[in-house]
Amino acid sequence: MADFKKTVSTLFESVDIQINGSRPFDIQVHNKLFYSRVLSGKSLGLGESYMDGWWDCEALDQFCYQMLWGRIDKQIKVKSPAFLMHVLRAYFLNAQSKKRAYIVGKEHYDTGNDLFALMLDQRMIYSCGYWKDADNLDQAQINKLDLVCRKLHLKPGMRVLEIGSGWGGFAKYAAENYGVSVHGITVSKEQMEYAQESCKGLDTSFELKDYRDLNGNYDAIVSIGMFEHVGYKNYRDYMKVARRCLDDNGLFLLHTIGRNTPSRSTDPWTNKYIFPNGMIPSPAQISKSAQGLFVIEDWHNFGQDYDPTLMAWNENFQKSYDNLKDRYDERFKRMWEYYLLMCAGTFRSRRNQLWQLVLSKKGLKGGYSYQNSHRPNS
């Protein structure tokens, strides 16, 4: 037991984190079994032990930043059999197959509209905001929605397909401010019903559908925060579907979290508790999947903006928890704050990125550009 504690203490000290130290990002350990649990389970052991109250940290976001910036993950050599099985499973199974496509909808996005309504902005946008010229979450999300509309060159009367429509925030904004018709698909029943109610009276429609079943012809396609659920085995098929549904002169905007290097597995804790079967793509994986199908017109990275987005979500969640605790117990609260704050640390450390790609079928004559600032009717 003493050896376990010494090993973990040495690892944390290598990234300037002290056990039972006095700084906000130092951790306070309450259970002596914490050390063996972390060494055997890595990220899964760290996250589950936090959920169980074995340790605390005043600034989880900065704790995560310290670990990732210092590359502590490269120093932990001990891997549990469960972790190794998780990696092997990712290699040999298609965890994002059509048969499994609705799992994340039921287990994450159907968690409860009450939780997301209190945590997110007024438009219920569950993706990175664009914080340029914004000082609050609502404005950052409006900025992001308008940025997407301008990048797609939206004009009144255009038909837009949204792959992964969430609670209908983009569809509502685009229909109200740009006069377009939006058809959205989702794998979450609660999201679909919320979007249908929210967008009543607008030229929008929503359905419960897997992206592989899509057909039709659209002037523009947008996918915001959905590609992370596709999986590397399906990236090429996803791009083929987008090409099939896009008009020859149309634009496709892909908004996704990205990682700096390719991976065929995801974080075990995140996979178990937050996004089952999720996977973050790399630049090479995206480029390869689009090769021969699309011309990449623009590639915009504003990953630094996910840090304040996640911090704002956590602030809203903490402020609202008294209204949620009858349904969500203390262990859920610790799980959720761990998810939000540790994710903030991944973006702060630049381990994760946020990309918006604009793609066309054959390249735009004269090149691609978009208006820097213009918001009609809003």
What do the predicted segments below correspond to?
Residues 236-248:
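A short glycine-rich, Lys/Arg-flanked "PGG" loop and its adjoining helix->strand segment in the class I
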